[in-house]
A protein has these predicted regions:
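Acidic, proline/glycine-rich low-complexity IDRs
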Residues: 1-4, 90-154
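Glycine-rich, often proline-containing surface loops adjacent to acidic residues and nearby aromatics
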Residues: 1-6, 66-78
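A generic structural motif
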Residues: 31-42, 103-110
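Short, solvent-exposed beta-alpha or beta-beta edge segments that form flexible loop/patches at the rim
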Residues: 39-69
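Conserved aromatic-histidine-acidic binding/catalytic patches
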Residues: 79-83
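Hydrophobic, Leu/Ile/Phe/Ala-enriched alpha-helical segments that form helix-helix packing faces
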Residues: 20-31, 65, 92-99
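Short, extreme N-terminal segment that most often corresponds to the first beta-strand
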Residues: 1-37, 148-154
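Well-ordered, non-membrane alpha-helical segments in soluble/globular domains
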Residues: 84-90
Length: 154
């Protein structure tokens, strides 16, 4: 099954690095030089890192958001893994509700939803724009201007 090469999470509010680090290490990640790595016996590896957007990124993204973006989380999926890989289950089992999971391995979307639920402020709203099948990364917009239902309908 296809797994996207990565995601970008964008939020209008700063993400607390300590909360990000604590979430990652509590869920089996290894923290090193502001990057978190998860390795699976299947050979799949996920790397996530937190940055402040550059001026150009902020200028590019601001028109889509009600305020300039403050934090960006890049998530890179290094390898493919099948959806029946049991090694994924303990780490990334999480609430998965209304994701548009066409062509995506649902375990990766569960992992991303856990990141959003546990690290970002709960009132931030998700807008998710999947990439073409052969391209990436996907975009996950986090913007309080939209309600959850409106966001999914856009």
């Amino acid at each position: 099954m296809y797994i996207p090469p990565g995601f970008i999470v964008i939020t209008c509010e700063p993400v607390n690095e300590e909360a990000f680090r604590a979430w990652a290490t509590n869920n089996g990640g290894v923290w090193q030089q502001s990057r978190i790595t998860w390795e699976f016996p299947s050979g799949c590896e996920i790397v996530a890192y937190l940055e402040t957007p550059t001026e150009k990124q902020a200028a590019d993204w601001t028109p889509r958001m009600h305020a300039p973006p403050q934090s960006v989380i890049y998530v890179v999926i290094e390898e493919y893994a099948s959806s029946d890989d049991e090694q994924w289950t303990p780490l990334i089992r999480a609430l998965l509700t209304q994701w548009d999971s066409y062509a995506y391995d649902s375990t990766v979307l569960e992992w991303i939803s856990a990141l959003l639920r546990d690290v970002l402020p709960p009132e931030r709203i998700i807008r998710y724009e999947p990439p073409p099948l052969s391209a990436g990364p996907a975009w996950i917009w986090v913007d309080s201007k939209y309600t959850k239902n409106e966001a999914y309908q856009q």
